Amino acid sequence: MTETLHIVGGGMAGSEAAWQAAQMGVSVVIHEMRPKVGTFAHKTGHLAEMVCSNSFRSDDDEQNAVGLLHWEMRAAGGLIMEMADAHALPAGGALAVDREPFAESVTARLHEHPNIRVEGTEITSLPAEGKWIIATGPLTSGALAEAIAAETGQESLAFFDAIAPILYFDSIDMTKAWMQSRYDKGETEEERTAYLNCPMDRDQYEAFIDALLAAEKTEFKPGETAGYFDGCLPIEVMAERGRETLRHGPMKPVGLTNPHQPDVKAHAVVQLRRDNALGTLYNIVGFQTKMKYGAQKEVLRMIPGLEEARFARLGGIHRNTFINAPTLLDDQMRLHSRPNLRFAGQITGVEGYVESAAMGLLAGRMAAAEILGTPLASPPQETAMGALIHHITGGAEAKTFQPMNVNFGLFPPLDGVRGGRRGRKERYKGYTDRAKAAWQGWLGQTALAAE
């Protein structure tokens, strides 16, 4: 008799992990505290309840990274995608879901599976023995959150987090921006050019501050705390404290020389920092924001060099429990200090329903393969799944790690494909064609593991 796999949390990730492992012949127990113990966001005791929007975003598997993730999950027999397709609503090129029947159907399928048992229990500590997947999401209960913090180090668990925007490097106008660290600090050329700089003159700065103060902001939701962490003040809050505050904070112009206009001293400078090992994504340093998405794009595109910016992720501030996965997890999503424990879903630092379910799919398959004595390698980075797991388990910068949606900036570059806006369609098709072939190859290895 094979070892039982225990899964804590019956959200998107936990539900998908359970399904994948059970389909491989492994006995699974899902520990879901709801409805006995509720949260301020959940309304039912159903598994895979959608508490935010009802959108799985774009379903285009040729030109969109999340659409590719849909394709990979469907190819892997994913329960979440099967039920989303069964309860899809008209939404153009997106996949929107009728959330209540969706959750009811996922719950029914899991309860009906002969290899799955669902227990309405709250897990309040990290188990010392057995194979476990922790998939408790951003609303992890207090006792378990404390146990995770004690095991990983308090600084590894964020309870309320600020997010700065991330954009694609190839959308930045380098005739206006330049690469330089303040005062040319660093021992290597890479260190001395670690930051990308966008200069503003006085008029541009004043117009930017006016737009920032006037922009529509998102208010805190009920149940969220309105306090800010030190060092994570939203830029609009700083601007409200004085028009010069940003110019003496994240936008200070000191220690920098614009090679495009070496004799002109900038009034303010916006800095961007590389956000992934590939150098395809950059985040705007110190630009945590509560501006609504539409206003955010409009205001940030006022920055010289970012007029045509394309965003991989927009900024925001919200409650989010997640671990610093790049320092804590191996490429099997196991905790370095406790290899019997895997983490999956939003708690690992992925953002979104689909990404959470995708990490559950991988965790379930890897855990099941390990139990069956045929361990699986992580999927290739060329796949959407592989790009995500690589990002959260080592590709991202640990010091600035923040939740991330899947996007093509996480994928290794293609050879011989034109860059920039004009080559985008060909480039994205190249990414998705390459990913599909690599994913099919990895699924073949998984099938052998289950035999």
Curated annotation (Swiss-Prot):
Its main location: cytoplasm. InterPro entries: FAD/NAD-bd_sf, MnmG-rel, MnmG-rel_CS, MnmG_N, TrmFO. Its EC number is 2.1.1.74. GO terms for biological process: tRNA methylation; tRNA wobble uridine modification. The keyword Membrane does not apply. NCBIfam families: gid_trmFO, PRK05335.1. Catalyzes the folate-dependent formation of 5-methyl-uridine at position 54 (M-5-U54) in all tRNAs. This is Methylenetetrahydrofolate--tRNA-(uracil-5-)-methyltransferase TrmFO. It comes from Dinoroseobacter shibae (strain DSM 16493 / NCIMB 14021 / DFL 12). The lineage of its organism: Bacteria, Pseudomonadati, Pseudomonadota, Alphaproteobacteria, Rhodobacterales.
